[in-house]
């Protein structure tokens, strides 16, 4: 059976091999694992529906289109959350729809990508999720919506691993290269983009190779003390 790997797993291993062992080999989960965000889920579903179901016969949808979609995903929200979400969508509309000449139908919305990699006679099943995949002139842009109240950019080495994993998976799935990974912070209307290169793919292959070696040799998963110990312990 293939060994499951994801961006979160790679980032955990990079931070601390022993934390990886505790969480994924021994099944010990942190309290944060059980968190849930109904408002964030509703926003993601609304934007997925808005881009998926828009007819694209006109250059741009009206704001009412987003609100119609929003109304279909608010049943589990409080009135305050529903109003908060409406304001967030208004910010999104002004920054990412009304400011464009036209919007184009994405390759896909709110989906999963899967790929495989063979290392040291071990098969790794690579899995990831995305909010939207857009076409670029020379490849693909993967868009990830963030509904957190604070803008917290990922560390450079961790975003590099995420980019590399998606690069590898999208190349297998669509035969196209990832050129850009973009984070859209819904509450502020800010977009942060990272270029994707073949070097990111090579980085992920190297890290997966290290995991394969540890699994094969059954050697100690060395701890890497740091700030992650507070949340992983």
Predicted regions and their residues:
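RecB-family 4Fe-4S metal-dependent nuclease core
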Residues: 1-233
């Amino acid at each position: 059976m293939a060994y499951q790997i994801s961006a979160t797993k790679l980032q955990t291993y990079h931070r601390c091999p022993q934390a990886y062992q505790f969480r994924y080999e021994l099944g010990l989960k942190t309290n944060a694992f059980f968190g849930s965000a109904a408002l964030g889920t509703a926003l993601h579903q609304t934007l997925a529906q808005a881009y998926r179901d828009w007819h694209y016969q006109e250059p741009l949808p009206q704001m009412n289109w987003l609100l119609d979609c929003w109304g279909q995903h608010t049943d589990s929200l409080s009135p305050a959350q529903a109003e908060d979400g409406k304001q967030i969508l208004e910010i999104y509309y002004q920054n990412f729809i009304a400011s464009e000449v036209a919007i184009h139908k994405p390759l896909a919305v709110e989906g999963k990508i899967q790929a495989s990699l063979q290392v040291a006679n071990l098969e790794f099943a690579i899995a990831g999720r995305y909010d939207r995949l857009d076409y670029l002139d020379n490849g693909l842009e993967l868009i990830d919506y963030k509904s957190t109240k604070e803008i917290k950019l990922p560390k450079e080495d961790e975003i590099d691993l995420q980019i590399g994993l998606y690069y590898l998976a999208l190349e297998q799935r669509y035969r196209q290269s990832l050129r850009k990974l973009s984070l859209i912070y819904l509450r502020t209307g800010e977009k942060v983009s990272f270029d994707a290169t073949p070097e990111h793919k090579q980085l992920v292959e190297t890290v997966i190779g290290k995991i394969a070696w540890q699994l094969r040799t059954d050697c100690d998963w060395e701890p890497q003390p740091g700030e992650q110990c507070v949340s992983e312990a």
